[in-house]
Amino acid sequence: MLHFNQFVILSAELSHLTPQENEIRTNQLQLMLTKLGFKPTEMIGRYKGDQETSFFVPTTRNDDIERLEFIAFDRFNQESILVQYSDGHSRLHYPNYIEHIGKVREITRQEAFKRDAYTFYPKLGKYYAAI
């Protein structure tokens, strides 16, 4: 995951929806990302203590980030997306502001479970969080 310089992590899920509703939204997001030419990788995320399916999306251009913001905020009503820029620094992008949160780094499972937010890559069995 970290061999990409710039990437976005986003989800379509909302904590107040049913698992079935969130599954539909997740499938819609994956299809939308693929049709737009992105190569999303499915992850398991935790945000504000709630587990959700999220997507790791490598980006090469800043207008890719803007497109992903539009999808997340306008189509799926997301609170934020995580963006790691090519300088290695990560930020949470909200509709009206940006919060600097450090750098995304690999962490242990034990460290992950102590956090309110992390990303798990099932294929590699690795956990990541902004530190």
Regions found by a protein language model. Name each.
Residues 4-7, 51-55, 77-80:
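Short, surface-exposed beta-edge/turn micro-motifs
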Residues 110-131:
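C-terminal low-complexity, charged extensions that often adopt amphipathic alpha-helices
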Residues 35-71, 75:
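Short, intrinsically disordered low-complexity segments
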Residues 66-95:
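Short, compact, well-ordered microdomains
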Residues 1-41, 50, 128-131:
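N-terminal, charge-rich interaction modules
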Residues 11-17, 60-62, 84-89:
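Short, flexible beta-strand-to-coil junctions
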Residues 33-36, 82-83, 105-109:
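Glycine-rich loops and low-complexity Gly/Arg-rich segments
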Residues 91-115:
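Short, low-order "capping/linker" segments at domain edges
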